[in-house]
UniProtKB/Swiss-Prot annotation:
Free-text cofactor note: Binds 2 Mg(2+) ion per subunit.
InterPro entries per the UniProt record, alphabetical: RNaseH-like_sf, RNaseH_sf, X-over_junc_endoDNase_Mg_BS, X-over_junc_endoDNase_RuvC
Protein name: Crossover junction endodeoxyribonuclease RuvC
Subunit structure: Homodimer which binds Holliday junction (HJ) DNA. The HJ becomes 2-fold symmetrical on binding to RuvC with unstacked arms; it has a different conformation from HJ DNA in complex with RuvA. In the full resolvosome a probable DNA-RuvA(4)-RuvB(12)-RuvC(2) complex forms which resolves the HJ.
The organism's taxonomic lineage, starting at the top: Bacteria, Pseudomonadati, Pseudomonadota, Gammaproteobacteria, Alteromonadales
EC nos: 3.1.21.10
GO biological-process terms attached to the record: DNA recombination; DNA repair
Species this protein is from: Shewanella frigidimarina (strain NCIMB 400)
């Protein structure tokens, strides 16, 4: 595994983070946010798709990992989040990338050591793990956390003597 694109989906702001993996080392390549400008949901979904297609073209990742949808108190928000995830997943599959998904608890555990970590704790640990000069913005930090979680899951399978492939870990269900 060489380059992982992690995505924290949102209908207004979608975070992305790209890391390169060399052995057990994680190297920061880039991160940021796709901020949608349209009020119309279909236009926002198109902006997410197009933005991720550009990022995939720029970084040429080998793996794609995304945060799993959680149950929100507001059903409308959960549906919009699911649609944003769909746009992101389509961008990945159109580029031929395998898709893996992880829950927020799995991501926080991989980055901070506890699934109940606060956003500020995640940002701080991302800064430390990737040796960044400053903490990334929240959505980008979450996306980097997704990529790190994917890498750690891969490393764990290898350490246990298993054959790691996108088909056997974090796979999309």
């Amino acid at each position: 595994m060489a380059i992982i694109l992690g995505v924290d989906p949102g209908s207004r702001i979608t975070g992305y983070g790209v890391i390169q993996c060399q052995g057990r080392q994680q190297i920061y390549l880039g991160s940021g946010c796709i901020r949608t400008s349209a009020d119309d949901l279909p236009q926002r979904l198109q902006q997410i798709y197009a933005g991720l297609c550009e990022i995939i073209t720029q970084y040429k990742p080998d793996e794609f990992a995304i945060e799993r949808v959680f149950m929100a108190k507001n059903a409308d928000s959960a549906l919009k989040l699911g649609q944003a995830r769909g746009a992101a997943i389509v961008a990945a599959t159109c580029a031929g990338l395998p898709v893996a998904e992880y829950s927020a608890t799995q991501i926080k555990s991989a980055v901070v050591g506890t699934g109940r970590a606060q956003k500020t704790q995640v940002q701080h640990m991302i800064k430390q793990l990737l040796k960044l000069p400053a903490s990334p913005q929240a959505d980008a930090a979450d996306a980097l956390g997704v990529a790190i979680c994917h890498f750690h899951t891969y490393q764990s399978l290898i350490a246990m003597g298993g054959k790691a492939s996108s088909r056997t870990y974090g796979r999309y269900k």
